[in-house]
Amino acid sequence: MKKLTFIVALIMAPVLVSAQNQFDSFEDENDVTSVVVTKNMFKLLSKMDLDSEDPEAKEYLDMVDNLENIKVFTTENSAVAKKMDAAVAKYVANSKDLGELMRVKNDGKNIKFYSKEGKNENFVSELLMHLSGDIDGKKMTVIMSITGNIDLKQISKLTSELNVPGSEELKNIKTNKKTK
C-alpha cells in the first residue's frame, strides 16, 4: 500500500506543481509587475502583536494565517497581456475543479473570478482573478491567484489593502452561489 501511495504521489506531483507554476513564469517577464506573498509572510503577520481585543484584527490574523500565497501579475504590454490571457484560459480549461465564481464587465474592464471549493460554501481553496481592460486610463491585464483556506467574506479586505486592480469587486461575491 505504501508503494502504491508513493507511486501515485510521484505521478501526481508534476500535475500539482504545474498548476502552481502556471503563472510563475510571468515573474521573470519584462514589462510585468509581480507581487508574491508567501506562507512565511502570512506566518509573520499572524504573529504580530496587534490589539488582541479588537475582533476585526483577530479576524484578519485568522484569515492570513490560513493563506498559502498570493500572486499578482500586472502588465500594460499588449504582447505579454496576450500570453497572460492564454495562460489563464489554459489553466481554467485544464483545472476541472476550478469553477467560475463571478464575471464583471464595467467601466471598460472585464473581470472574471474562478474558485476551487473549500471546506464549506463560505471558503475556497483557490481564488483566481483575471482582469483585462482600462485601469486609470491605461490598458492593463492582471492575474491574481490566492491559495489556502480562503474566507470569501474576508478576502476582499486583504486584497483591497494590497491595492490589486479589480479586487474591489470581491466584496460583491455571493458566497453561497458558486457555479461550475
What kind of region is each of these model predictions?
Residues 45, 57-61, 72, 88, ...:
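Amphipathic, non-transmembrane alpha-helical stretches in extra-cytosolic proteins
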Residues 149-180:
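C-terminal partner/receptor-binding element of secreted or periplasmic proteins
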Residues 4, 15, 40, 75-78, ...:
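Generic structural motif
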Residues 81, 116-121, 173-180:
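A general structural signal for short secondary-structure boundary/capping elements
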Residues 1-25:
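Bacterial Sec-dependent N-terminal signal peptides
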Residues 30-36, 64-70, 74-75, 93-111, ...:
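Extended interaction-bearing regions that mediate binding to partners or small molecules
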Residues 84-148:
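Surface-exposed, polar helix/loop patches in the mature regions of secreted/periplasmic/lumenal proteins
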Residues 24-88:
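Early exported N-terminus immediately downstream of N-terminal targeting peptides
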